[in-house]
Structure formats: structure tokens, C-alpha cells
Amino acid sequence: MPRTRSDRGQRRAEIIQAATEVIAERGYRGATLSAVAERVGLTQQGLMHHFPTKEALLVAVLDARDQWDMASAALRGQAWPLDIVAELVEYNATRPGIVQAFTVLVGDSVTDGHPAQPHFRERYARVRAGGADALRAAYGDHLPGGLTPERAATLLIAAMDGLQIQWLLDPDSVDMPAAFRDFLALLAPPPAPGTP
């Protein structure tokens, strides 16, 4: 009996989950297609039927991570309020393998012709828009320093990505969640005159 589309979708979901686990255990470089294939009971060739390259599989893992992150925010009733963004940074501190895979892939994707480049262009456009919405909900059309939410969203993402890199390089010295909350505090309006 031929496999149905839902069977293939289920198998792809199993592969993505296995890849997420392998990345968490071994890191980006240690996560091989053969290790993922073994985890789901496939040959490497069988896995490559679903994901032809390691990059394609890792992009699918990152897509699944993004979907989960957005669904978690939606369950709380709003799309990306700033406190949930801070919680996401805190959660990322518990999954270094996924953060490492993201960082390596996004770095590689800046080269011409990289297969993940369209994915990351679209992702960053979507995340900038979501960040701008979160900032607009918190501050209105201008932040205390005068920036528009759109301009500030670019800085918000730069802070998140930059903190991830610093944390990956020196996790004992960089408290990523605390540093991100410090960044958000910089966006807060200045205290009213006469307030301590």
C-alpha cells in the first residue's frame, strides 16, 4: 500500500523531532544525517528522500522551532509582547544545540547561492515585522528615544542574535536572558521628573 501524504508528513515530523534531539545532544557539527536516520529507523538514503541535505533538514528544524515559539506566544493571547520575547531568550538558553545550529546556518546563509538564504531573508522580514508590532503595542508609534518601532525592531533582533553568539562563545560569562532584559530596560521611558 503506498504511503499517503499524511504518512509522509508524519514521517517528516518524526525526522525533524529526531534531528532536534540529535542537535541538542551533539551540537550542530556533531549532528549527522546518519545519526538522525538511525534515530528514526531509516537509512541515510531513506532520510535524504525527505531532506536531501543536512542544510535542508536543519532549516526544517529551525522552521519547527519558530512555529513552536510563535504558537507558545499565541497561547498567551498576544503575538509577541516584549515579555514573551524575553521569555523566549530565556528558553533559548536551555537549548544551546538549536541556538548553535541557527547561528551557524544564518552565518553560512549570507554567502551567495546558499540554499538557506531565501529562508533567512523571509524569516528576518517576518521577525522584524513581529518585533515592530510588539514594540508598537508597548510604546505606540515612537519609542522614548524617538525611533519608530520598525527601526527599533532591527536593533531588537540584532541584540538577540548578538547575545546568542556571545553566549555560545562564553556561556559562563554571558547571562543571555539577563542581558536581554537589560536591553529591554534601555527601551523603557525615562523616569518622570521628581521620581526616584
What are the language-model segments listed below?
Residues 1-9, 191-196:
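Actinobacteria-biased recognition of intrinsically disordered, low-complexity terminal regions
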Residues 11-14, 18-60:
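Helix-turn-helix
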Residues 51, 104-112:
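Short helix-capping/turn signature of helix-turn-helix
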Residues 60, 71-99, 145, 149-156:
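Hydrophobic alpha-helical connector segments
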Residues 63-69:
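Short, basic, alpha-helical segments at the C-terminal edge of helix-turn-helix-like DNA-binding modules
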Residues 73-78, 96, 114-140:
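Amphipathic alpha-helical packing segments from all-alpha helical-bundle domains
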Residues 113-122, 139-187, 191-196:
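Hydrophobic/aromatic-rich alpha-helical bundle segments in the mid-to-C-terminal region
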